[in-house]
Structures are given as C-alpha cells and as structure tokens.
Amino acid sequence: MAERRFAAMRRLAGALALAGMIFDSPQALALTARDASAVVGLIEALQPEFGQFAYDEEIAADWYERDAADKGLIGTAGFTADSWKVALGETMRGFLATMPVAELDAIFAKLRNAISGMRELTEAQKTETIDAIDEEVEGLMILRTEGDPFADVVRPLTPKIRSLILGPVMGQ
C-alpha cells in the first residue's frame, strides 16, 4: 500500500516538475514589446551581412549560429538559441496577423502573375512553381492565424518589419 502511494506521489511530483519546466520555458512566455523590438532591430542589423530575411525555423537557427560565431548580437540582446527562435517566430506570426488578407492575396497574385509571364519557363514549370507558391500561401495563412495573440504587441513595429522583409521583395 505504501509502495503504491509512493509511486503515485512520484508520478505527481514528476508531472508537477514537467509542468514547471513547460510553463517556465520561453515557449510559454508571451511575446513582449521589448523582445519584438529587439528581434526587429536584430533583423535590421544582421540582414546586410546575412542576406534578405525570410522566416522559418531553420533560418532562425542559422542566423543564431552564424551570429554567435561572429558578433554575438543576438546573445547580447538576451536571447538564447531557443528564446530567439520563439521570439522571432512569434514576431513574424504577429506581423502576418497584422496584415490584411487582401494585401497578402495581392502580393501572391502579383507573384503568380510574374511567374505566369516568364517566357523562360515551360508551362509545366510554371504550373509546378505556382502550385508550390500556393502551398506556401496555405502555410502562411496558418502562421497568420497563429499570430493573433501577438498582433497587438507587433503592430507598432509593422511598418519597420514591412520595409525590412517586404520592401526589397516588392521593390520598395
């Protein structure tokens, strides 16, 4: 009987410890204005050296590793590899959530039209490329929905993010 009670208490302690780790982890923390602003400043500072920024988790990890091996700006700003990935992801999701769907649709329509007009591609290549874009759009719309909780924090930074990420792409 005591052995069962001890085992149950051990499981409970393990569950509480796990819950503590989960809720104490960067993923459980809400995006702060300070972190979002730091992320945008770091993109601006690192983009000339690392190239045009386009968000995904691999790029987030790559930028962290490259910066850690060089200037260490991300770490100096207070981010670990994990907290950088989380803050960057939440900032980008929040940015997407601030963008009207009509604007995103217009951006991708322009891209599809440009591909359709490329004479150097065969019709099959055009179709394949446009299909790949459509898959990316679906993924972006999911990220946009996931960004709703972060939109208010990111909204003041939207013009800056737009110029950093969309400006070069849209010829601005």
Spans of features found by a protein language model:
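Bacterial N-terminal signal peptides that target proteins for export
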Residues: 2-13
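Immediate post-signal-peptide N-terminus of mature secreted/exported proteins
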Residues: 28-72, 148-172
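Mature extracellular/secreted ectodomains of secretory-pathway proteins
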Residues: 62-138, 146
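C-terminal segment of classical bacterial N-terminal signal peptides
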Residues: 20-27
